């Protein structure tokens, strides 16, 4: 096989994950079971050795020979307090070999013992094979991640595990660093950033605070609980149902290992369901002594069962902040890692603790670490081809970008958090007859009206040939390159005439703090904005209707089809409405709607009559373009003269 690219491997306590950077993006690779994460489990049976899903699936039948949690042993001495306390909970045996721990199992009928590095190397081998099966190439180079608090011997042992697995470990990087790289936080411009990584996995909970400056990462503090994770939440649910079974059936299933195991599997599934639904049902046939167990649990009950554990996740956050000598307001970014951070309650507690700050969660939390490791692997293996240097570290546009349209409305072309580079084009038109030019004003921000957003720059496109309103087509293109530089161009489709502006991201752009603030304000103002948007839209719709109606009855195609009295009736009413609009630019939505009803009352009967007599109008209705009109000049809102076209 040919040599494949470098991969990133997240070697986790309970699950591992592998990713590769190719074709300009990171791909997280699924295993042969179609799962994008693989259990860090190795099982030994009379006939074979199983790794991953196969190992975890048979743990109930073969508990003493199924090894997991090797990460809790790696690089530690046998008499380490951690090893001694963990040993009590494991079904497999840990023995002392000259001061080093080894796991002892029965394999093919004989007793074998393995160092933690060997067990981890088996998991790494599996991850390597998963990547090779997907890529169809040999994989040797890898970046492997470890917790930030790992000491030198733990790091070295992890590297050794890689070597045993036949990998050339390019670098060992910290899990929180990898997660920050996944979100491209090291590529954001400006002064140093403080990033808090909240990593709640299957069996461990780690909080890390990093500072990033000029692409250099420094771990400021770490805190957490090495024995808190998804499994604990499962246990609470298991105990809840054991108690329920006792109440319902007067039987205690807690001593029956198989029953408890089946219940635990069902609980883990229910827990996952509760992250997206508010209720989950559990159905287990013949759980115990032939009794079928059918029950359900609500999200609220699940949250209540784990209330203390969920709340307790904030203690390490506070400790990490204290150790880093930072106030929570000084944290620029919060990154969620680990499957348990999908739990809505945990997200809410964390977001509330940080006063409503947005959390970085767009990358699958189980995969964020492997994602960042894959990016790092591509960089370290000198991937110049895809220009990973420039391209990646997944930069996004922090704020929406758009232009001002009729009535001072912000029309967004690029939504916030769009991955860059990106390019968007939209067509606009004029709002008054024979309008010679348009003013393109570029804004960033989340508000509905441009006056509440930040003006980045503006330019004019002139020399538009005389034409009725709504006829010219002006194509506006927003193009952001990998360095965040924005090019905005406008082209008049009829003449091909073009003008453009380049906006670089340093000057005139907002600071990170401003961005945070604006995003938060935007939430608060969303309701007001909706109202304002509705108002402008009902005003535009009334205006359009009046102008179009006027144009329709004045059209020469209708000469002789409409009697003068009807025509005058419509024109008078239209002119009355147009002059009312001039005086009442800031009226309420209801007033615009009322005026439109009045206008329709006059026009509809006449137009209907017209249609019936003409059997449909020749050439269809002239005028009438979507998006509605704009305030006539001199209106209170003297927005720029361009109009959105669907």
Curated annotation (Swiss-Prot):
Region (Interaction with BAG1): 186-377
SUPFAM superfamilies documented for this protein: Actin-like ATPase domain, Heat shock protein 70kD (HSP70), C-terminal subdomain, Heat shock protein 70kD (HSP70), peptide-binding domain
EC number: 3.6.4.10
Omega-N-methylarginine PTM sites in chain numbering: 469
BP GO annotations: ATP metabolic process; axo-dendritic transport; cellular response to cadmium ion; cellular response to heat; cellular response to hydrogen peroxide; cerebellum development; chaperone cofactor-dependent protein refolding; chaperone-mediated autophagy
Known catalytic reactions: ATP + H2O = ADP + phosphate + H(+)
GO annotations of cellular component type: asymmetric synapse; autophagosome; axon; cell surface; cytoplasm; cytosol; dendrite; dendritic shaft
Induction text: Constitutively synthesized.
Glycyl lysine isopeptide (Lys-Gly) (interchain with G-Cter in SUMO1) crosslink site(s): 512
Biased composition (Gly residues): 616-632
PANTHER family in the cross-refs: HEAT SHOCK PROTEIN 70KDA (PTHR19375)
Family named by the database record: Belongs to the heat shock protein 70 family.
Name by which UniProt lists this protein: Heat shock cognate 71 kDa protein
């Amino acid at each position: 096989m040919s040599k494949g690219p470098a991969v990133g491997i997240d070697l986790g306590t309970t699950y591992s994950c592998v990713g590769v950077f190719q074709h300009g993006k990171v791909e997280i690779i699924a295993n042969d079971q179609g799962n994008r994460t693989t259990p860090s489990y190795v099982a030994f049976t009379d006939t074979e050795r199983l790794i991953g899903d196969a190992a975890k699936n048979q743990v109930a039948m073969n508990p003493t020979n199924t090894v997991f949690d090797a990460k809790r042993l790696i690089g530690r001495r046998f008499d380490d307090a951690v090893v001694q306390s963990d040993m009590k909970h494991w079904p497999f045996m840990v023995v002392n070999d000259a001061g080093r721990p080894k796991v002892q199992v029965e394999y093919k009928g004989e007793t074998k013992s393995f160092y933690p590095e060997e067990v981890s190397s088996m998991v790494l081998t599996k991850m390597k094979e998963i990547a090779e099966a997907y890529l169809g190439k040999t994989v040797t180079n890898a970046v492997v991640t470890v917790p930030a608090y790992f000491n030198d011997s733990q790091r070295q042992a992890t590297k050794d595990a890689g070597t045993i697995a036949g990998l050339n470990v390019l670098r060992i990087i910290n899990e929180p660093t990898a997660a920050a790289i996944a979100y491209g936080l090291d590529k954001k411009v400006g002064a140093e950033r403080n990033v808090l990584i909240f990593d709640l996995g299957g069996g461990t909970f780690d909080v890390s605070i990093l500072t990033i400056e000029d692409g250099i990462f420094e771990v400021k503090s770490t805190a957490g609980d090495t024995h808190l994770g998804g499994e604990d939440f499962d246990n609470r649910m298991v105990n809840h149902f054991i108690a329920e079974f006792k109440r319902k059936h007067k039987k205690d299933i807690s001593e029956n290992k198989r029953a408890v195991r089946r219940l635990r599997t069902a609980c883990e599934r229910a827990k996952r369901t509760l992250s997206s639904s508010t209720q989950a049902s559990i159905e287990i046939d013949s759980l115990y002594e032939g009794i079928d167990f059918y029950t359900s649990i609500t999200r609220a009950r699940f949250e209540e069962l784990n209330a203390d554990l969920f709340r307790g996740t904030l203690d390490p956050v506070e400790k990490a902040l204290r150790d880093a000598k930072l106030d929570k307001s000084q944290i620029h970014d919060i990154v969620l890692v680990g499957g348990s951070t999908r739990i809505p309650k945990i997200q809410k507690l964390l977001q509330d603790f940080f006063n409503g700050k947005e959390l970085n969660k767009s990358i699958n939390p189980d995969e964020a670490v492997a994602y960042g490791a894959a990016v790092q692997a591509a960089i370290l293996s000198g991937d110049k081809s895809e220009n990973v240097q420039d391209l990646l570290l997944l930069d996004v546009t922090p704020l929406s970008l758009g232009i001002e349209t009729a009535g001072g409305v912000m029309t967004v072309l690029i939504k916030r958090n769009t991955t860059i580079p990106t390019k968007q084009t939209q067509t606009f038109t004029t709002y008054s007859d024979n309008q010679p030019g348009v003013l393109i004003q570029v804004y960033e921000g989340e508000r509905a009206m441009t006056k509440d957003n930040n003006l980045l720059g503006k330019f004019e496109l002139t020399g538009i040939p005389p034409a009725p309103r709504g006829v010219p087509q002006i194509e506006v293109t927003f193009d952001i390159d990998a360095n965040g530089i924005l090019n905005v161009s406008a082209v008049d489709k009829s003449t091909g005439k073009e003008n453009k502006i380049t906006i670089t991201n340093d000057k005139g752009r907002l600071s990170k703090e401003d961005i945070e603030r604006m995003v938060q304000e935007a939430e608060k103002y969303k309701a007001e904005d909706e109202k304002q948007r509705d108002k402008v839209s009902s005003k535009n719709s009334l205006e359009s209707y009046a102008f179009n109606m006027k144009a329709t009855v004045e059209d020469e195609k209708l000469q002789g089809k409409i009697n003068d009295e009807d025509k005058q009736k419509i024109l008078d009413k239209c002119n009355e409405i147009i002059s009312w609009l001039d005086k009442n630019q800031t009226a309420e939505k209801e007033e615009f709607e009322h005026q439109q009803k009045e206008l329709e009352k006059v026009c509809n009967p006449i137009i209907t009559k017209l249609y019936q007599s003409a059997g449909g109008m020749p050439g269809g209705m002239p005028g009438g373009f979507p998006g509605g009109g704009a305030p006539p000049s001199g209106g209170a809102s003297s927005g720029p003269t361009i109009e959105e076209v669907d």
